[in-house]
Amino acid sequence: MKGLSGSRSHHHVVTCDPSFESMGHHLDHKPYLISQIDNPHPVDHSYYSQRSPYQPDCVVPYGTFPRRHYSSQHELKDEMAVVPYSGGGVPASKGQQRLPVALLDQFDRQLPVPRDGYHTLQYKRAAAALEQRSDSPGRIRHLVHSVQKLFTKSHSLEGPHHGHGHGKGSINGGKASPDGEPPAIRHRKRSKSRERCKSAEPKNRTPPSGYWSSDELEREACLFHHGPPGVMTMGRHPDKSQSQYFLEAYNTINDQALKNSRSNNDLGKCSTCTSIPLSVDASQLVKKSSWSSSLTVSRARQVYQKASVNVDKALVKAEACQQERSCQFLQLWKCVFVELSVCLDADMHVWAKVCDVASLLNRQVPQDEWGGFPLGKDEDIPCRRMRSGSYVKAMAEDDSGDSDGSPKPSPKMQARRASYLKATQPSLTEMTTLKISQEHSPKLQIRSHSYLRAVSEVSINRSLDTLDPKALLASPQYRSRNESYMRAMSTISQIEAMCESVFNEMESHAVDALDLPMPGCFRMRSHSYVRAIDQGCSQDDDSPLLPASPPRTTTTVRTIQSSTVSSCITTYKKTPPPVPPRTSTKPFISITAQSSTESAQDAYMDGPGTRGEPVLHSGLSNSTESIDSMKALTAAIEAANAQIHGPASQHVSNSTMTISTAPPSPLPLPVPVPVPIPIPALEDVRRDVLRKSRCLSIGIQSKFQSVGVQVEEEHGVTTAVQADLDTPDYTPADSPVTDFPAAGCLSRQYSRDAATSTVSIQGSGNHYHACTSDDYEDVGFDPSILPPPDPWIDSVIEDSLEVVGRSVCQRDGRWFLKLLQAETERMEGWCRQMEHDEKENKMPDEVLGKIRGAVGSAQLLMSQKFQQFRELCEENLNPNAHPRPVAQDLAGFWDMLQLSIENISLKFDELHQLKANNWRPLDPPERKERRLPPPVPKKPPKAHPPLARDRSLESTEKQRQEARKRLMAAKRAASVRQNSATESADSIEIYIPEAQTRL
C-alpha cells in the first residue's frame, strides 16, 4: 500500500528533499501539475501537461508540493504506466514543443528519450531541481535516459507497453493494451484514462484485467490525488523515507540491486533510508519512485489479482510469468512493505495507511466499478459510477447525512462526527485530519473521514477475530461490492500479509469498514449518546467482557452480539436507561431482563460486591430522596454499565441464562471481573451514598435484594438483554436463588441495584417504602406506627416490591415470603410492645382486654393464616409441588391477609391512642364533657345523655372509621404503588431491553 502511495509520494519525496523543494517552485513542475489538474484530457495530465505549454501562471497556482507531487505523480505514474500516452516512441519533444523554451530545455535534459508510456515529469522536476543544484544536464539526461530504458524494459516485460497494445498478453496487459494503444492513441487513451473508469476502461479493469496498469493507476491517482500524496503517506513524507529508501534500493535498477533490496538488510536500510544523503540525484529519486511505482503498481496488481492468500505464491506465479520483472517487482514490493511495516508504528499509522491505500485503490480501481470514495464532482473522476455504488451508499449512511454530492458534511454532522470520533478514537480523528485536512478536497476529506470513521467503528464494533480478511473477501456482501473493490481489498489483504500481523488486523478492519454491511450501525450518535459512550468507554475498554460474555445469544442488539462490548459502546445508549419506563411491552421480558440484569449486576456486585456491597446492602435502604436522586443516576449509570458491560453480562446471562437459579451467581463471576472494574466505583459511591442516606426499611429488602423494582431496574438494564431471553419464570426463582447462593455478591448487587434500580423502577414504591420500612423496622412496634398503618403497609408492599424486584418484580413465593416475614416481625413487635406495656403499666381492665384481644388476634393470624401463606409460598418455590400455586394465587391470598392485617392494625392503633392517653379510656372524657353542656338546658337534659352517649359512640366510631379509612387508603396506595412499581419495573426492564435493542 505504501508502495502505491509511495509512488505518489515519490514526487513528494523529491519535492520534500531540500534539494528538490525548489523543483516545486519551478514553472516546469508547476505547469505539469497544473496541466494535469486543469486539463481533463490526457493532455491535462501532468503527462500531457508536459506536452502542453506550461504557463507561469499555472505554475504559480500549483507551486505547492501537492502540485509538484501531482506532476511527479503523473509522470511517475505515466512512466510507470504501460499506457502509451506519449506513445512508446513519442518523444518528450512533443510535449516539449508546447512548453516554453526553458521548459523544453529542461525536458530535453530530462526527457531525452521518448516516454514510451513513461512520464518523466518527476524526472524533469528532479532534473530541474538538480540543475538548480548545479547537477549537469548531461548527467541528469543520462540518468533519465537510463531510467526510461529500464522502465521500458520492465514494462515490456510486463507486456503493458500500452502504447504498443500488446499489453493484453502481459499480466497487466489487459489494461495495458487498452492503455497501451499506439502512441497516437495515447492522447486518446490519456483522456480515456478518465473515461476509462466511466466506460471502456472498466472492462480493462475488470477482474480479468484486474491488474491496474501503473499508468492507469498513476493517471487516476494523479487525477484523484492532486494534493493527497502526502495523505497517502499518512502524513509521513515519503519523499525522504521512501525516496531515500527507494534510492538505496534502486540506485541501480538491476537484478543485483533488486536482490539487494529484497534482502532483509537492504529492506531495513530502505526503512532507514531517511539517513540517505540528500545529495542523491533527484533523477535517482525519480527513478526509484517512478520505477517502484510502475513495478509496484503493475506488479502489485498482478500479485494481488492472484488473490492468493500467500503473497509468496502470488509472487512466484508472477515470477513464473516474468522472471526478471517479477523479481524486480518482488524486491520493490518487499521494500515497500518493509517501509510500510516500519511506518506502521501504531494503529493510527496503520489505519492511515489503510485509508490511503483504500483511497488510492479507489482512484486506481476502475471507477465505474468503484462505488466508494467518490471524489467531489469538482474533481474530475473518470468514473462517475463511484458516486452511486452500493459501497458509496454504505459510506453515505456511515457518514450519516454526508451525501456524496455534498462537498462537505453539515456542521451538525461534522460536530457529531467529531464528537463520535473523539469518544471512540481521537487518534483516528487526528490521523484523519492529518491525512485528509490539507491535501484532499473537501469531498475527499469527507470520504476519508467516513472511511476512517468506518474503519474506526469497525475496529470498535467488531472483534478482531471476526474480521478475517479472507472471510470478509469471501463473504457475499463483500463480493456484492464491486469486483474492482474486491481487487482493491484483495490487494490490501495481500499487503497486509506482506506487512504481517502489524497490518493484518488493521487491514481486515479496513476491509470490513469498507464493506460495512451494517452502515447504520456506524451512524453518528447524538451527543448524549456520545457522552454516554465516553462514560462507558473506560468500562467498555475492559475487553475481558468480550471473552467473559458467552456467545451473544439472541440479544436484541445485533451490534452488541457482533461486537459485544465495543459494539455495546456504540450500540448501547447510556443516556436512555435513565428514562426508565420507555415502554413496558413485555413484563416477562422485564422479568427476564431483570434476571439478566441481575446477572450483569451480580457480576458487577460479585466483583464490586466484595467491595463491601453486602454490608452497604444490608445497611442500604433506598431512602425516598436517595432513591429518587439515585434513581436517575443509578438508572443511567447502571443502565450504561449494564449496557456497556451488560452486553457481556447479557450475553453471559443469555447464553448461561443468568436468570437460572444457580447460574446467576456464576454468571456474575464471569462478568463481574470485567464489569465491576468500570461500574464499581460509580455504583459503589452511589450505593454508599444511598446506604448512608439511610433506610433500613430497604435494609430488609436489600437483604432480599431490596425492592424488587430496585433489583429489577438494576437487572432491568442487563435484564434488557435477558429480557430477550424472556425467562421470567426462571428469573423470579433464579434471582432469589441467586441472591441466596450469591448472597454476599448478589445481595450487594441487589442492594445496590435496589438503591439504583428501585429508584427508577420502584420509584413511588421505594419512596414510601424507604420511609415506611425504615419506620417500622426502626420502631419495631412503636405505637406511633399503629396510627399510620399505612407506613407498615407501604413498607410491606415496598418489601414485597423489593422482593418482586429482586425476583424481577415478579411476585413469587420468595417475594411473598419476604413480605410475610416483614409483616410477621412487625406484628410480633407490636405484641411484645403491648405485653411489655401491660406489665409495666397499670391499666383498666377495658384497656387490658383490648391489648389482649389485639395481641391474641395478631398471634392467631400469624400462627394460622401466616403459616398457611408461608406454606403456599414454599410450595410455589418448590418446582416439584404438584398443586404448585402460582404467583397470582399467592397475591390473592396475600390480599386476603391484608384485610386481617388491617383489622389487627386498627386494634393496635387504638391501643396506641390509649397509650398516648396514659391508658385511660378515650370515651369517658368525651361523655363527661358532653354531659356538662346538657345540664345547662334543663329540658333537653333527658334527651342529652343519650345524645352524649351517641356522640361519644359516634366519635369512637368515627375514629375507628377514620383509622379504617386510613388503613384502606394506605392499602390502596400500597397496592397502587406496588402495581405501578411492578408495572414500571416491567416497563423499565422492557425499556432497557428496547434501548439495547434499539442500539
UniProtKB/Swiss-Prot annotation:
Membrane topology per record: Peripheral membrane protein
Span list, region Disordered: 155-213, 395-418, 918-989
One example GO MF annotation: molecular adaptor activity
Single Gene Ontology BP annotation: modulation of chemical synaptic transmission
Cysteine disulfide links: none
Superkingdom field: Eukaryota
One GO CC term on file: glutamatergic synapse
Annotated Basic and acidic residues bias: 194-204, 923-932, 947-965
Composition bias, Polar residues: 976-985
Record Pfam families: GKAP
Protein localization: Cell membrane; Postsynaptic density; Synapse
UniProt-listed InterPro entries: SAPAP
Keywords: Cell membrane, Membrane, Synapse
Main location: membrane
Locus of motif PDZ-binding: 997-999
Main function: Part of the postsynaptic scaffold in neuronal cells.
Name of the protein described by the UniProt record: Disks large-associated protein 1
Organism: Danio rerio
Gene name, Swiss-Prot/TrEMBL: dlgap1
